[in-house]
Each structure stands twice: as structure tokens, then as C-alpha cells.
């Protein structure tokens, strides 16, 4: 099947949102909010391509007066071009958040990138991206920031503190649009050019250029995302993803090249995928050469959790109903799997990861805050990440912070950065960050104003 062929195929009894959006914008006849399809020569494609004018709003099902007309490129699937990319930034949460907000679980820093935005064509059943109701996510269109690499390069030139470039925590970096626009590649090249490490997170094939760039810095690494060992379930959960056999072969190939491989087993959909199946997945990953696994049980905002449940029941029948029976806990405003089930599972899974030579960590996994008697004090959530992690950092690979004094110099690792990163650094060193930099010790949600300040080591 081609990169986009699955969008016209049946993936179950439910109406996959990715397919719904694709079929809406590709319908041949004009209608309200869709002009007729026409052929136009395009310099980026270097040929004539199918385009049409569409009227979109920044919330799903926006009224006509709240829509604007944009040109939509229909190949290889509907997308629009935007001039200004989302700025580079760190994690969305810092160490010292409000007590009403779930605490940040990420041990170390990363620089978030967004080479492509909006809708994602991998079409994962559980994905929060395609279920979004606001912004470009709600339009059902992909967004492509033009000259993304140049925009990233200009921002990096202003930065004096840095971390690994995360490409990307949103849509997949290697989707078919990458072959046309090269935004992920140009972004990665800019990070490498200034001496910063990178990591990619993907459910699609790693291109050769990505593997080559990962070899440029010993702190760079590859991440892939997979949450079942059953090929049929995988097709239903992530219909646009690489096959499991191809994924394992790709892991072998990167492992032989000496690339560190971290796997996000994320999200585990309890009831549909059993712990026994996750252990079998660990066995296949270890045999292929993976180094680290990160587990997370599925969660969803309450506004769309019922839709997810309905979708799972339609796709998986009785197993979907079992999932519904476990998908019962409210923690930090998110609906997730029963706490007792999750904690018992993490204990089991971490044991088997260690048995197989894999390090283990969790991602955004919480439990209720309780007193010594077990009474619940708060349902906001307390991170369980440190309890179950067998690696120094939750992403597995030890990646320090980076700094430089001026734009004409390369970034260099902070020598006394602790293996575990910034989040616990000061708390475990008598309240003082080991590098001596106050801002690093606060582990804030880094914005560009923060990234412009060099790390002042003492």
C-alpha cells in the first residue's frame, strides 16, 4: 500500500477521523466551503498539482462568518502552507507548577519543534492530535511552515542554552509531505550545525539522512513508538504506520550502526492489549537491538474520552468493552486506566524489561496523593516516574544540557550536568543546582527568553 493508500481503505466499523478529513477535502464536486479542484504549477513541487480554495475556522464546525479562505494543496493529501512556524520551546510544564496542575514528569530538558502541524496522516485511533477541536487540528488539514529550516536556524542563532531537539512530539517527522518540503530534515540539520543533539519520534520508516544525522552527536538517539505485538491490532490502532516486521528490521539496522534506540510503548490500551502481549513486544524489541522502553497507559481529556471508548468498542468488540471497564480513573482532569491495574502492570513490566536487558521508564504516569493511612489527599496526581525508572533519564539516553557564550561558537555539553537532568538536580543536592545556574535549577517550562541566556556554571 502507498503512503496514503490506507486513507481510502476500511479500518474498522468506526469512522476514522483521518479518513473523514481526507475524504471531505478530496471530494471531487465543489460545495459550500470548497471550491472546484484545479491544476496549478507550483515551484516547490516543480509541476502542476491539484489545489482548491477552502474556508476554514479555528474551531471545528465554525460558522461561516468565522472562516477564512485559504489555498489547499491536495497532494499527497490536503495541506496548507503557513508563513510563521511555531516558536521553539522547552516542555510545556516546569518544576514549580500550580498544585492544581499535574507536575512535570520529564527528568531532563528538550527543545520542542513542529515541522508540520494540524492533522496527522498516521491516523492513530487514540491520538489527541486528530481529535483536537481548536486551531489547525480542528480543521482536518496539515499545516506546512514554509522555509522551516531557515526559521529554526534564526532562532537557534539567538540561543545560548540548549538541549536535544525533539523532532517531533506532534505529527510524525517522516510523513509523506517530508519528501516534498524536507522540514524535518532541514530542522535537524540546523540543530546539528550548531552542535546540539537531536532525536526523532516516529511510527514511519527512518530515512537514511536521519540515521546519518543521528551519528553526528553521541547524545543523539532514535525513538520509535509502538504499543502492541499483534500486527492486526497494530493496523487497527495505527493504520498509517510502518508494519511491525519492518519496524523491528529498522531497529536492527540502526542498532548495528551504533545508534541508541529508545522505544515509546505508548499508549498501552489495557483490555485491548494485555500485559502478556507487552512483554512479548519487549522480547521482540530486545532481540532487534533496542536499548530502552518507555511505557504509558492511555489517557484522554473528558471531552473526547467517550468517543475513544466508542471507537475502541467498534474496532475491538468485547476487548473494547473490557477497556471501557478499566478506563475509569480521573486523575489531574484526565481519564485514564484504573490506578491499581497500572501500578501492578508497571511492577511486572519493569521486571521483564530488566530481565531482557532493557532499561525502563514511564511517561506521564501518576497516582493519587495519599497520607500514610492510604486516605486520598489530592486527585491532581503525583508522578511515579522516579519509582519505576531504571535509567538515569526517562528517555533512556543520558543527554546533558548544552550552552555557549556567543552565536559564533558551537554549543557544548555542560560538564557537571547530573545524569538525571534538571528536574531533580537541586532537590537532590541540598537545594543547589550542580552546575550553579539558578534557572537550570528551577527547571522551568523554557521559552525563547530563557533559551537566550547562557548557563552560568560555577
Where are these regions (language model features)?
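Auxiliary Fe-S-binding modules of radical SAM enzymes
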Residues: 2-64, 68, 279-458
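Short coil/turn linker and secondary-structure boundary residues
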Residues: 13, 29-32, 49, 143, ...
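Short secondary-structure boundary segments
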Residues: 34, 38-82, 161-169, 173, ...
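Conserved Radical SAM active-site core
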Residues: 69-223, 231-232, 253, 439-458
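Conserved AdoMet/S-adenosylmethionine-binding subsite of the radical SAM
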Residues: 147-337
Amino acid at each position: 500500500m502507498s503512503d496514503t493508500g490506507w486513507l481510502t481503505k476500511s479500518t474498522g466499523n468506526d469512522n476514522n477521523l483521518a479518513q473523514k478529513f481526507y475524504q471531505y477535502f478530496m471530494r471531487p464536486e465543489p460545495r459550500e466551503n470548497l471550491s472546484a479542484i484545479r491544476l496549478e504549477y507550483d515551484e516547490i513541487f516543480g509541476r502542476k498539482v491539484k489545489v482548491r480554495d477552502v474556508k476554514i475556522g479555528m474551531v471545528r464546525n465554525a460558522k461561516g462568518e468565522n472562516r477564512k479562505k485559504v489555498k489547499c494543496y491536495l497532494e499527497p493529501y490536503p495541506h496548507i502552507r503557513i508563513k510563521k512556524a511555531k516558536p521553539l520551546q522547552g516542555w510545556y510544564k516546569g518544576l514549580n507548577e500550580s498544585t492544581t496542575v499535574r507536575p512535570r514528569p520529564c527528568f531532563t530538558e528538550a527543545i520542542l519543534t513542529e515541522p508540520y502541524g494540524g492533522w496527522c496522516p498516521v491516523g492513530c485511533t487514540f491520538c489527541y492530535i486528530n481529535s483536537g477541536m481548536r486551531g489547525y487540528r480542528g480543521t482536518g488539514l496539515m499545516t506546512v511552515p514554509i522555509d522551516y529550516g531557515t526559521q529554526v536556524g534564526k532562532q537557534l542563532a539567538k540561543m545560548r542554552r540548549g538541549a536535544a531537539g525533539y523532532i517531533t512530539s506532534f505529527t510524525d517527522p517522516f510523513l509523506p509531505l517530508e519528501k516534498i518540503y524536507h522540514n524535518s530534515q532541514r530542522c535537524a540539520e540546523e540543530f546539528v550545525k550548531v552542535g546540539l543533539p537531536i532525536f526523532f519520534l516516529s511510527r514511519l520508516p527512518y530515512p537514511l539522512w536521519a540515521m546519518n544525522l543521528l551519528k553526528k552527536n553521541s547524545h543523539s538517539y532514535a525513538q520509535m513508538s509502538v504499543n502492541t505485538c499483534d500486527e492486526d491490532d497494530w493496523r487497527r490502532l495505527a493504520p498509517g504506520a510502518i508494519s511491525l516486521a519492518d519496524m523491528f528490521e529498522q531497529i536492527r539496522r540502526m542498532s548495528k550502526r551504533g545508534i541508541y534506540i529508545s522505544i515509546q510503548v505508548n499508549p498501552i490500551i489495557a483490555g485491548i492489549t494485555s500485559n502478556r502481549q507487552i512483554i512479548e513486544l519487549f522480547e521482540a524489541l530486545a532481540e532487534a537491538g533496542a536499548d530502552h522502553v518507555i511505557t504509558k497507559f492511555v489517557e484522554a481529556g473528558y471531552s473526547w474520552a467517550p468517543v475513544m471508548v466508542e471507537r475502541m468498542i467498534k474496532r475491538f468488540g468485547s476487548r473494547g468493552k473490557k477497556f471501557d471497564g478499566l478506563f475509569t480513573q480521573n486523575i489531574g482532569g484526565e481519564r485514564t486506566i484504573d490506578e491499581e491495574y497500572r501500578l501492578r502492570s508497571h511492577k511486572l513490566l519493569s521486571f521483564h524489561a530488566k530481565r531482557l536487558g532493557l532499561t525502563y521508564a514511564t511517561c506521564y504516569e501518576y497516582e493519587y496523593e495519599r497520607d500514610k493511612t492510604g486516605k486520598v489527599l489530592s486527585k491532581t496526581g503525583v508522578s511515579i516516574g522516579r519509582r519505576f525508572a531504571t535509567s538515569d533519564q526517562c528517555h533512556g539516553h543520558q543527554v546533558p544540557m548544552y550552552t555557549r557564550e556567543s552565536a559564533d561558537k558551537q554549543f557544548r555539553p555542560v560538564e557537571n550536568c547530573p545524569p538525571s537532568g534538571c528536574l531533580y538536580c537541586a532537590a537532590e543536592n541540598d537545594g543547589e543546582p550542580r552546575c550553579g545556574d539558578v534557572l537550570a535549577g528551577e527547571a522551568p517550562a523554557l521559552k525563547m527568553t530563557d533559551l537566550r541566556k547562557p548557563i552560568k556554571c560555577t
